[in-house]
Curated annotation (Swiss-Prot):
Gene3D superfamilies: P-loop containing nucleotide triphosphate hydrolases. It comes from the Eukaryota. ATP-dependent RNA helicase associated with the nuclear pore complex and essential for mRNA export from the nucleus. May participate in a terminal step of mRNA export through the removal of proteins that accompany mRNA through the nucleopore complex. May also be involved in early transcription. Residues 97-264 form the Helicase ATP-binding domain. ATP binds at S110, Q111, S112, G113, T114, G115, K116, T117. Its EC number is 3.6.4.13. This is ATP-dependent RNA helicase DBP5. Its main location: cytoplasm. The Q motif is unique to and characteristic of the DEAD box family of RNA helicases and controls ATP binding and hydrolysis. Belongs to the DEAD box helicase family. DDX19/DBP5 subfamily. One of its GO terms (biological process) is translational termination.
Length: 456
């Protein structure tokens, strides 16, 4: 079982919080603060309170410092160990609402890199009774990779507490195994399987989180499994849904399953990729797409790059072919063995590999800060075969992370793929610039110049 236990307990606020916080804060240099890598929106966060009589602009619903939240010193230590000096805009508004008593449900729309993961992890850790060795907080993510990343945040933030944690993923826990960890991060299918087989007792759960909720609820199987998990929770359980995007159908569903929720939203235009220079390359056919990709290999390795494909077979075929030609690349998709998936994403995250060919399994939420270039080898489509602007947003959002600059390139090779890109360009109101593929030097120069701007 993937359970862990750390040092000291964190039950409630303490009198020497400010002294400890200021001491740790004083140790942070400007470089440390910069390294926390939070994206700050240029617009204010919009708050809609469940209590219509309450004023969302009241100081009661805003926290300019972590100390103002009344957190235990051990949680504050964890926050500062993560190099957060003050709450981001989304945290400033979300945390007072998430931590209020009695607990209230929340529907939150927030882009990756704004500190939303830290916000819901902090909520989970704050609700836990550290003397009760039972599951008390569960968060679900749509992919194994994202669940592991969330657990990394949880373990870092909780390292000064004695919380016990468990990753509820295939090959991490066995069916029927009894999980007593207080904080559980998992995927919907495995978590529901463990609940159904009596491996997880949900009677004491206080907080249930769906991350990337639009993905969960929009995909039929993940949505159904997530709802089954949610239906096992006590009625008093606080339900939190976070996502970068909330299409109307998903939002309506979220409101139904999280009644009386406070809401935090960014305007749709704020969920953009302003710092990412977007290009497209007009290829002759599928074979030409591969040839152009190979020509770009030297540019792919300047930083780190992700190549997104529509199918697992395509990802494997490209990776195999490029490897045979002497190029160092890795592929990642849901059909790989779990150990291979973990090893591949860890090597990429650690910077040991430079080029990753993937399906949408890492399109959402994955934080790999060194990614400077994303290629859409295939344009993203919905399950009904329509252009998928939201997945496109998530895909190219893997570069330009946390407000930094980045470059994305779309491959189009026929009228259909051109039409998909055109629909996405209009939906996102962005500009995608053509780069000629018949002049290698000009092609390399254009992309290199765009990549050079990243450091400026």
């Amino acid at each position: 079982m993937s359970e862990s236990k750390d040092k000291t307990t964190a039950p409630a606020a303490d009198s020497n919080v400010n002294e400890i916080a200021s001491g740790i804060s004083g140790l942070l240099s400007s470089k440390d603060v910069a390294e926390s890598n939070l994206r700050e929106s240029s617009h204010e966060v919009q708050v809609t309170l469940a209590d219509q009589q309450a004023d969302p602009n009241s100081p009661l619903y805003s926290a300019k410092s972590f100390e103002a939240l009344g957190l235990h010193e051990n949680l504050l230590k964890g926050i500062y160990a993560m190099k957060y000096q003050k709450p981001s805009k989304i945290q400033e508004k979300a945390l007072p609402l998430l931590l209020q008593n009695p607990p209230k449900n929340m529907i939150g729309q927030s882009q990756s890199g704004t500190g939303k993961t830290a916000a819901f992890i902090l909520t989970m850790l704050s609700r836990i009774d550290y003397d009760l060795q039972k599951p008390q907080a569960i968060a679900l993510a749509p992919s194994r990779e994202l669940a592991r990343q969330i657990m990394d945040v949880a373990r870092t933030m909780s390292k000064f507490t004695n919380v016990t944690t468990c990753l509820c993923l295939p090959d991490e826990v066995k069916r029927g195994e009894k999980i007593t960890a207080q904080l559980i991060i998992g995927t919907p299918g495995k978590t529901f399987d463990m609940i159904k087989s009596k491996g997880i007792d949900t009677a004491a759960i206080k907080v249930f989180v769906l991350d990337e909720a639009d993905n969960m609820l929009d995909q039929q199987s993940l949505g159904e499994q997530s709802i089954r998990v949610k239906n096992t929770m006590p009625k008093s359980c606080q339900l939190v849904l976070f996502s970068a995007t909330f299409p109307t159908n998903v939002y309506d569903f979220a409101v139904r399953i999280a009644p009386g929720a406070n809401e935090i939203r960014l305007k749709q235009e704020e969920l953009s990729v302003e710092g990412i220079k977007q290009f497209y390359m007009d290829c002759k056919d599928e074979d030409h797409k591969y040839e152009v990709l190979v020509e770009l290999y030297n540019l792919l390795t300047i930083g780190q790059s992700i190549i997104f494909c529509a199918k697992r077979e395509t990802a494997d075929r490209i990776a195999q072919k490029m490897t045979q030609e002497g190029h160092k690349v890795d592929s990642l998709h849901g059909r790989l063995e779990t150990a291979d998936r973990d090893r591949t994403i860890d090597a990429f995250r650690d910077g040991k590999s430079k080029v990753l060919i993937s399906t949408n399994v890492i399109a959402r939420g994955i934080d790999i800060q060194q990614v400077t270039l994303v290629i859409n080898y295939d344009m993203p489509l919905t399950q009904t075969g329509e252009a998928d602007a939201e997945t496109y947003l998530h895909r190219i959002g893997r570069t330009g992370r946390f407000g930094r600059k980045g470059v994305s390139i779309n491959f189009v090779h026929d009228q259909q793929s051109w039409s998909y890109m055109d629909q996405i360009e209009k939906a996102l109101k962005c500009q995608i610039t053509r780069v000629a593929t018949n002049d290698l030097e000009e092609m390399e120069y254009t992309i290199k110049e765009a990549l050079k701007q990243i450091g400026k």
